Amino acid sequence: MRRIKLIVAYDGTHYAGYQVQPNGNTIQAEIESVLARMHRHPVKIIASGRTDARVHALGQVIHFDTTLEMPAERFVKALNAMLPDDILVKQAEEMDDTFHARYGAKRKEYRYHIRQTEDPFRRHYAATVTYKLSLEAMRQAMERLIGTHDFTSFSVTKAEVEDRVRTIYEAEVLEMGDEIIFRFVGSGFLYNQVRIMVGTVIEVGRGKYQPADITQMLEAKDRRVAGITAPPHGLYLWNVNYEKVD
């Protein structure tokens, strides 16, 4: 058996998320369906993490085991020929059998895009926020999220994890053209954590909270004290890094 690593991009607009579900089409189901046709038997894929309905990815990482003898790079063309147009395999590489897309990940980067003007052609790819925002206040708020913290206040109550301590290495607000982008690099993220952090920072930007309130929210460990959950369609899984972090 050989282990193949894929880097995959997808437009999550028309999917019920990454993970296979009994109702609704998913990214995992589409890729596994194509691999099953290629292998003539079911093939299970493992991803670096799950993305929700309408969430996008530029650098999702997946692995699977195969008995096919074709060179790893040929999987790119073979898969893309059969996958729908909103899923693209960008790269394929043969790995050692110790590689694991989920458990081997050291850092993940997420980006969240917002626009301050309505645009019907980009409505699925950036959230629209029409009120005035203070970039300086939002940047100060983002700085307070950097470090190792218990992010209970920034995760959903139903999250099935006992340890909610995560490390954020980088958190910044970028301006790119007519969009504002919230960029996070961390050791890992709780369910809905990025969307809740973004929703809260946006509310800092509009004056509902002060940047210093972020520290109090972290200390409270209570979801009710943080801000809203930003909608899913502005969120992108940007990159997954497997190199050891110093």
Swiss-Prot record:
Keyword set for this entry? Answer: Isomerase, tRNA processing
Q: What does this protein do?
A: Formation of pseudouridine at positions 38, 39 and 40 in the anticodon stem and loop of transfer RNAs.
Source domain of life is Bacteria
Broadest EC class assigned to this enzyme: isomerase
What are its E.C. numbers?
Answer: 5.4.99.12
The active site consists of 52 (nucleophile)
Chemical reaction(s) catalysed: uridine(38/39/40) in tRNA = pseudouridine(38/39/40) in tRNA
Positions binding substrate in this chain are 110
State the oligomer form and interacting partners: Homodimer.
Q: Which species is this record about?
A: Exiguobacterium sp. (strain ATCC BAA-1283 / AT1b)
CDD domains the record matches: PseudoU_synth_EcTruA (cd02570)
The alphabetized list of GO BP terms reads: tRNA pseudouridine synthesis
Q: Which family does it belong to?
A: Belongs to the tRNA pseudouridine synthase TruA family.
- Name of the gene encoding the protein in the UniProt record: truA
Q: Which InterPro entries does this entry report, sorted A to Z?
A: PsdUridine_synth_cat_dom_sf (IPR020103), PsdUridine_synth_TruA (IPR001406), PsdUridine_synth_TruA_a/b_dom (IPR020097), PsdUridine_synth_TruA_C (IPR020095), TruA/RsuA/RluB/E/F_N (IPR020094)
Q: Which Gene3D superfamilies match?
A: Pseudouridine synthase I, catalytic domain, C-terminal subdomain (3.30.70.660), Pseudouridine synthase I, catalytic domain, N-terminal subdomain (3.30.70.580)
| Pfam families, per database record | PseudoU_synth_1 (PF01416)
- Provide any one GO MF term from the record: RNA binding
**Record protein name field:** tRNA pseudouridine synthase A
